[in-house]
Amino acid sequence: MERNFNNFLVKIFCLGDDGVGKSCVMNSYSSGGPLTSLFQGSELTWTDYTVSVTHNQKPLKLRLVIGDQNELRRIKQIEFNDVFLICFSVDSKASYDNIEKWNTEIRKILPTPNIILVGTKIDLRKEGGELKKSIVTQEMGIEKAKEINAIKYMECSTATYEGVKEVFDESINIYMTKKLYIQDLRKKSFLIPKKNTNKKSCKTQ
């Protein structure tokens, strides 16, 4: 029997320090291109939207939420399969140092969350063809992802669109894997025969 993917609402929460590009990442993905050509001179805002996408030739709805600690606490329906993007900018060591803070806030609400650590603004990593000083390297991102028990470390740039779609494709894959796993477990639980507690033992007369 083919599953009805139209009923799935994939929830992706985007967190991180101010200025790391959370709204830009959401806008770039929903628009399907780099922001340099699509949103020149416009002010980008994003809070909580639902968008329709096609993933692996299946129509899906995504709820994309940008939030802080208070926003997370207000959202009552956070589920086991929801995905959290902890974002930091590779040109901001301060935002990198605050990753642990965001990880802690998420785990206060959900002890075993699905986290992808995302390094943004990778187009700013090099200046004049040379690696900038005091920049967060890919190796540092990978190591930090291991420290916070993230599922994966990924990087992107909304100026070039590099890696943006891949971040959300991976988020959807994680969500769907967990969602279908839970559904299959529930189905199997109905198939397990229940023990007959009313069965009487045979007694010798």
From Swiss-Prot:
GO terms for cellular component: cell projection; cytoplasmic vesicle; cytoskeleton; plasma membrane. GO terms for molecular function: GTP binding; GTPase activity; protein kinase binding. GTP binds at residues 16-23, 66-69, 120-123. It comes from the Eukaryota. GO terms for biological process: actin filament organization; cortical cytoskeleton organization; establishment or maintenance of cell polarity; regulation of actin cytoskeleton organization; regulation of cell shape; sexual reproduction; signal transduction; small GTPase-mediated signal transduction. Its main location: membrane. A lipid is attached at C202 (S-geranylgeranyl cysteine). It is found in: Cell membrane. Pfam families: Ras. The modification Cysteine methyl ester is found at C202. It is a lipid-anchor. Keywords: Cell membrane, GTP-binding, Lipoprotein, Membrane, Methylation, Nucleotide-binding, Prenylation. Residues 203-205 form a propeptide. A motif (Effector region) lies at residues 39-47. Belongs to the small GTPase superfamily. Rho family. This is Rho-related protein racJ.
